[in-house]
Amino acid sequence: MRLHENKELFADAIQAASRGIDDGGLGIRDIFIEKDYWICRSLRLMALADTNGLAVHKGGTSLSKAYGIGARFSEDIDIAILDADKMSGNKLKTLIGHLSKEMSRGLDEIVIPGATSKGSHYRKEYFAYPRAVETEQVGAIRSGQLLLEINAFANPFPYTSCTIRSFLTEFLERSGNQSLIDEYDMQPFTLSVLDKRRTLTEKLVSLIRCSLADNYLYELSAKIRHFYDLHFLLDDPECREYLKSTEFKEDFDVLLSHDRKLFAKPDGWQTKDLSDSPLITNLSDTWEALQETYNKEMPGLAYKSIPTVGQIQASIRTILGII
């Protein structure tokens, strides 16, 4: 992906793509279109560098980009390593370092004390890209900055191969500009992505874990995006069928048990039973306490209208009724 090398054309394409749908654009804010370009570029560089197929894209960004589930944005690129437990410490550290270097090619690192982490099993790094839009920030989304997380503690299985295309590629396709796609290497590409059903289970277990914490409202507020994602995952036909299956219940129990062994944080959660969760015992009051956070944070992350708080509560109630 090299469209950014032609700065004037890049800026013009972003502005054209950000126009309303009736005006031939995508109806998505310019800051989202620009950041999406750089996220997709990093993912494409990862796909090229990951010759052994050990890196898997996961998290909320993967839902919208790979599966078209939901319409929210995230500044982070979440990557998990397959079969990390079968690698030596040095091999794993080398692999993570290699992926980080390739995915951030041409970008400047931003070292943030207390946030940047470069361990042998986990990396969290911030990078700056050259801005082409004037908008500096919308909600939690900052222009000019990417967050890359590479994690060897997760088990990203099952996964599948998905086609990824940037918003700009989508716009160029719709507007009949295939020649620009070819000239600037803007073609869609394939990538290993965590199965959406596994993502559903992980997000649900994460919410349960946070709800069992001593300071559960604070912990759940930090995961408000999970409520949004679960609403749209429930709306997906394959995920709905999965929720009805014995496979889901088995996967949920296994992952919850796994997390109890792996995560000591947040404080207090490991000693409590599932039935102690305020999401299960008193969803109405718990969600009412979280609604302000949802209404404040999610509109700035979504590029389409967000579900109402009532719709989110109904979806979460449906899912919790299954477990």
Whereabouts are the PLM-identified features?
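Structured mid-to-C-terminal alpha-helical surface segments
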Residues: M1-A55, Y67-A71, L82-I323
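Glycine-rich beta-strand-to-loop/alpha-helix junction loops that act as flexible
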Residues: H57-T61
